[in-house]
Amino acid sequence: MYNSACPEGRSVISRRRTGLGDCLWSLAAAWSYARHTRRSLVVDWSESCYSADPNINLFPVLFDNINDIGGVSVHYVSRTSSLALESSVIPAWWRLPVKQRGTRSDAQIFRERDELRNLFFSRRDADAAAVICDCCLMWCCDEDLEREFYDHLIVNQYVRQEVDRVYAERFLGNVVIGVHIRHGNGEDILDHDRYWCEENAAMNLVAHKIREERRKFPFRSTKIFLCTDSPAVSEWFRREMPGLFATEKEFRQRGEGELHSAHFGLGGAVAALVDMQLLSRCDVLIRYPPTSAFSRWPSLLVERVFDFDLARGVFCQADRKAGGASSG
């Protein structure tokens, strides 16, 4: 059984409603702070962009029963936004009575993000009983701790079975080059549009890198596993790249936006997690753009990861242990 009540005492509440990669990365940061300050962790993934039902907490839908992560007690609630919270809470906006909160402006969200980042990096404990994290907290967790956090997660049985099925059919006996291409399909998240000023040139850059990596395995069967949010990108690579495969998914129409949408229901979140897990099993991972949160978890597990450096115009091999990257 999941702990489904807000705990008494000190806690960190991670409330996210965005794409799965952002939800997980931000949750890892909240967990890290909870562990450092010996607080409990509360997960609120209700009102998710993947579901039309605001009461469904997405985390228990995707992951098996987890009541403890690395010594941190974990609890699950829904709709923190409608809870009357005690005065001992930060950021201060959450102290307002529910009827006065309304919708937070972007400026308010960015202020909260900066406040929480400063708190997390300072490694000091807050005086407040509850710390509410309702903003993007990417890059706010030590990478070794982040790996440890992901190691504790257990995806649900359906996802495990689907990943094992695709792995047996497509991965076994092959070198698999995973390619994650975040296009946006009409939306500009994290300023990704700047990577797509010349769309055909961008896709050719990725294709060139795929061929370059393929040549490194002259005596092995190689396959390309593609994850993208764009029907145009999918069509282009299926046409240009022999040996490419992808999981079956429905795209939104061109220009209508990304895949994390209530249009696809909870099945969209499940499909995203399947793709995420399969990327983690690849021998090589190519990311364009590299800042997408979706492929963050896989990028910490795959041995050879190549991220595109827009300033230099080349793919660089990630070298996170050394704190840098080399072109390759």
From Swiss-Prot:
Protein name: Nodulation protein Z
Pfam families tied to this protein: NodZ
InterPro entries: GT23_dom, NodZ
Coiled-coil ranges (or none): none
Similarity section: Belongs to the glycosyltransferase 23 family.
Reported function: Fucosyltransferase which adds the fucose moiety of the nod factor on its terminal reducing N-acetylglucosamine end. Uses GDP-fucose as the donor group.
GT23 domain location: 6-317
Origin: domain of life: Bacteria
EC number per UniProt: 2.4.1.-
Organism from which the protein derives: Azorhizobium caulinodans (strain ATCC 43989 / DSM 5975 / JCM 20966 / LMG 6465 / NBRC 14845 / NCIMB 13405 / ORS 571)
Keywords: Glycosyltransferase, Nodulation, Transferase
Broad EC category: transferase
One of the GO BP terms on file: oligosaccharide biosynthetic process
Gene Ontology MF, one: hexosyltransferase activity
Transmembrane segments: none
